[in-house]
Amino acid sequence: MFPGLAAAAAAHRCSWAALCRLGGGRAATRGRSQGWKNVMTFESFTYVVPDIHPHLSIINQVKLYSTNVQKGGQGSQTPKADKVPSLTQTVENIGAELKAPLKQDPLQVRVKAVLKKRDYGSKYTKNNFITGVRAINEFCLKSSDLEQLRKIRRRSPHDDTESFTVFLRSDVEAKALEVWGSLEALAREKKLRKEAEIEYRERLFRNQRILREYGDFLGNTKPRSRAVSVFLKGPGKVVMVAICINGLNCFFKFLAWIYTGSASMFSEAIHSLSDTCNQGLLALGISKSVQTPDPSHPYGFSNMRYISSLISGVGIFMMGAGLSWYHGIMGLLHPQPMESLLWAYCILAGSLVSEGATLLVAINELRRSAQAKGTTFYKYVMESRDPSTNVILLEDTAAVLGVIIAATCMGLTSITGNPLYDSLGSLGVGTLLGVVSAFLIYTNTEALLGRSIQPEQVQRLTELLESDPSVRAIHDVKATDLGLGKVRFKAEVDFDGRVVTRSYLEKQDFDQMMQEIQEVKTPEQLEAFMLKHGENIIDTLGAEVDRLEKELKKRNPEVRHVDLEIL
């Protein structure tokens, strides 16, 4: 009936569903201009098929053509055609295929295990450690009570011990409540013990005083104390020599002023008196500076030298310069005739020799100290590295110059008979003392404010830390001079976490660690594993800090206090 259609169907052997998909794929680019109809054309016959599925694209024209097959000398022959499905069957086949469920792979979703965040609150003390001494003192416990508690070994913050035993504060508090029953009973016991401690200290003080009196009565010789031995060498020796010489000069200058009435001699007498008082103050500062640190002063009392030197500078200005200016101005306003100046010249000559000897002692001490510090004499004096000897040097220099000024002005007065020259000498000595006091006030104030050490020394300390493998960088370096050759060093250290972790792993058993890793199956087990080794790594980091501090102090003995902060 339709030989062309039958021949095409037998040749291609394709399903209608495939043809429909082919036509739909080609029609996807043509838009949806055909609306809701699908057009299928077989040669000259066209059928309209309704759109039965929303996902089926519009099928445009699909045409099948017949083919003439020539064999030998025969004419065209038409092959036997298979049964062609009807239009209704074709539509039903297409609808059934489209309605069939699509095969999809199962959807796999990765669920992220998240550790629940803990709320520690504003105050959390369950992980605080406390030493045995604090537990006994603060909670009124006995050593036997602590034996039943958990003991934990931790790194010691002191250089003399590697580690020490601590207890959990929560365990100690629970034990205290078990022993005393309530917080009120514990508070009452602490109050009673505090009163007993005060009474014990009072009895101890009385007993020590009785022992001192008994020792003095028997003439018992005690070992020389540190405060006494410090005056036998170094700056203490210079101060004691200056006190003795200036005391004698002050006495003889006052006698000369009383005998002659000279304003210049009065200024020199006041000058020697102020020097003697100030040097006594320096001796007190030196004695105080060598005291051992206590809980109230953990960094010691080395700044007492700067404080005493500062007060000495103020005293020189008020007593020495002030009185000299006053007496010189009064001499200019109300000149008085003077007696013979022979004795005054003799006393000034003796003063020049004695003050010069003290000046040489101070210069030699400063030169020796400057060589020990590796700096020049001038720089050592200007930076006031040794405040006590510095004061002696400046005072004796001013004393020698003052004697020369006073002798010159008194000589002019003797030659001319004009007392105004003597008053001008008093003003000159006062001005000299004012300059010395201003220099002392400035240098000691700078030292008390916290003066940095030499830049070369800071660079050397920084390079020592940076050369360590566990350190990445050093920031915010502060190195201050505490006096008495003591240095405080502070820096923020950026540690290399890989090196610190490797240092920890080198001390671990890898087989045991691998076994622990294989046993981790749940988030809780992973948390326990990480907490265990994380805490140990933090302890390793603290040990690295302690090691660097000890190394820094060992190579630089002048560095007494080191504060390394982890960045």
Swiss-Prot record:
<comment type="subunit">
    <text>Interacts with GRIP1, ESR1, AR and CTNNB1.</text>
</comment>
<feature type="transmembrane region" description="Helical">
    <location>
        <begin position="423"/>
        <end position="443"/>
    </location>
</feature>
<dbReference type="GO" id="GO:0003713">
    <property type="term" value="F:transcription coactivator activity"/>
</dbReference>
<dbReference type="Pfam" id="PF01545">
    <property type="entry name" value="Cation_efflux"/>
</dbReference>
<dbReference type="InterPro" id="IPR027469">
    <property type="entry name" value="Cation_efflux_TMD_sf"/>
</dbReference>
<keyword id="KW-0496">Mitochondrion</keyword>
<dbReference type="GO" id="GO:0006882">
    <property type="term" value="P:intracellular zinc ion homeostasis"/>
</dbReference>
<feature type="transmembrane region" description="Helical">
    <location>
        <begin position="391"/>
        <end position="411"/>
    </location>
</feature>
<dbReference type="InterPro" id="IPR037129">
    <property type="entry name" value="XPA_sf"/>
</dbReference>
<keyword id="KW-0539">Nucleus</keyword>
<dbReference type="InterPro" id="IPR040177">
    <property type="entry name" value="SLC30A9"/>
</dbReference>
<keyword id="KW-0812">Transmembrane</keyword>
<dbReference type="GO" id="GO:0031966">
    <property type="term" value="C:mitochondrial membrane"/>
</dbReference>
<keyword id="KW-0804">Transcription</keyword>
<comment type="similarity">
    <text>Belongs to the cation diffusion facilitator (CDF) transporter (TC 2.A.4) family. SLC30A subfamily.</text>
</comment>
<keyword id="KW-1133">Transmembrane helix</keyword>
<comment type="function">
    <text>Acts as a zinc transporter involved in intracellular zinc homeostasis. Functions as a secondary coactivator for nuclear receptors by cooperating with p160 coactivators subtypes. Plays a role in transcriptional activation of Wnt-responsive genes.</text>
</comment>
<feature type="short sequence motif" description="LXXLL motif">
    <location>
        <begin position="461"/>
        <end position="465"/>
    </location>
</feature>
<keyword id="KW-0256">Endoplasmic reticulum</keyword>
<feature type="transmembrane region" description="Helical">
    <location>
        <begin position="313"/>
        <end position="333"/>
    </location>
</feature>
<dbReference type="GO" id="GO:0010821">
    <property type="term" value="P:regulation of mitochondrion organization"/>
</dbReference>
<dbReference type="GO" id="GO:0016922">
    <property type="term" value="F:nuclear receptor binding"/>
</dbReference>
<dbReference type="GO" id="GO:0005856">
    <property type="term" value="C:cytoskeleton"/>
</dbReference>
<keyword id="KW-0050">Antiport</keyword>
<keyword id="KW-0864">Zinc transport</keyword>
<dbReference type="GO" id="GO:0005737">
    <property type="term" value="C:cytoplasm"/>
</dbReference>
<keyword id="KW-0862">Zinc</keyword>
<dbReference type="GO" id="GO:0003682">
    <property type="term" value="F:chromatin binding"/>
</dbReference>
<dbReference type="GO" id="GO:0006829">
    <property type="term" value="P:zinc ion transport"/>
</dbReference>
<dbReference type="GO" id="GO:0045944">
    <property type="term" value="P:positive regulation of transcription by RNA polymerase II"/>
</dbReference>
<feature type="transmembrane region" description="Helical">
    <location>
        <begin position="238"/>
        <end position="258"/>
    </location>
</feature>
<comment type="function">
    <text>Mitochondrial proton-coupled zinc ion antiporter mediating the export of zinc from the mitochondria and involved in zinc homeostasis, zinc mobilization as well as mitochondrial morphology and health. In nucleus, functions as a secondary coactivator for nuclear receptors by cooperating with p160 coactivators subtypes. Plays a role in transcriptional activation of Wnt-responsive genes.</text>
</comment>
<dbReference type="InterPro" id="IPR002524">
    <property type="entry name" value="Cation_efflux"/>
</dbReference>
<protein>
    <recommendedName>
        <fullName>Proton-coupled zinc antiporter SLC30A9, mitochondrial</fullName>
    </recommendedName>
</protein>
<feature type="transmembrane region" description="Helical">
    <location>
        <begin position="341"/>
        <end position="361"/>
    </location>
</feature>
<dbReference type="GO" id="GO:0005634">
    <property type="term" value="C:nucleus"/>
</dbReference>
<keyword id="KW-0472">Membrane</keyword>
<dbReference type="GO" id="GO:0005783">
    <property type="term" value="C:endoplasmic reticulum"/>
</dbReference>
<dbReference type="GO" id="GO:0015297">
    <property type="term" value="F:antiporter activity"/>
</dbReference>
<dbReference type="GO" id="GO:0031410">
    <property type="term" value="C:cytoplasmic vesicle"/>
</dbReference>
<dbReference type="GO" id="GO:0005385">
    <property type="term" value="F:zinc ion transmembrane transporter activity"/>
</dbReference>
<keyword id="KW-0813">Transport</keyword>
